[in-house]
Amino acid sequence: MTVISTNKDPENLRLTLVAEFDSTPERVWAVWEDPRKLEQWWGPPTWPATFTRHDFVVGGESRYQLTGPNGEVHRGYWRMHAIDKPVRIDFANGLAGADGEPTPELPPVTGYATFEAISSGTRMTAVIQFLDLAQMEMMIGMGMAEGMTQAIGQIDALLTSAPE
């Protein structure tokens, strides 16, 4: 089923995407935990991700780059704030410079993903919390909601193709 709802909430400075998968929470969790699986869905289909670092522990950091269809590169990072396997991940997600390190010009957004067992498999809820309305409008204007929807839309195929 993949993404079943997207909610842009400027009053609370949040973007929420809800997706459902015909798989267990543990298997959906694994597509976040394993960097090689993460590379197969983080980023829209025409902007594949490469994770050069993925320290998936509380306080750990990840570094990644998205490569566009014309070879353009955008870098980003995560900082893990809390991990409750296989229930919830809390993290900061920000832009990085050419060296892969966080850029101070644009503060990171915070976010979390939850994984809930339901009768048909797993409901994953991804929430991005913006610092202010200007940041939210800028990132939504850059296509963040559509990009996340396309990215999450790739998880179904990954779960189907991966062995149990």
PLM regions with names:
Residues 1-48:
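Hydrophobic ligand-binding cavity/cleft-lining segments
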Residues 16, 36-75:
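Short beta-edge strand/loop motif at the mouth of beta-sheet-based domains
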Residues 17-19, 51-54, 76-82, 108-117:
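Hydrophobic/aromatic beta-strand elements that line small-molecule binding cavities or substrate pockets
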Residues 24, 69-71, 83-85, 96-98, ...:
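Short coil/turn motifs at secondary-structure junctions
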Residues 25-26, 56-57, 81-88, 114-123:
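A short, structured loop/turn motif at beta-sheet edges
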Residues 28, 38, 62-64, 80, ...:
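Hydrophobic pocket/interface hotspot
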Residues 51, 159-164:
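Short, highly charged C-terminal tails/helix-capping segments
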Residues 92, 99-146:
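Beta-strand/loop substructures that line and gate deep hydrophobic ligand-binding cavities in soluble
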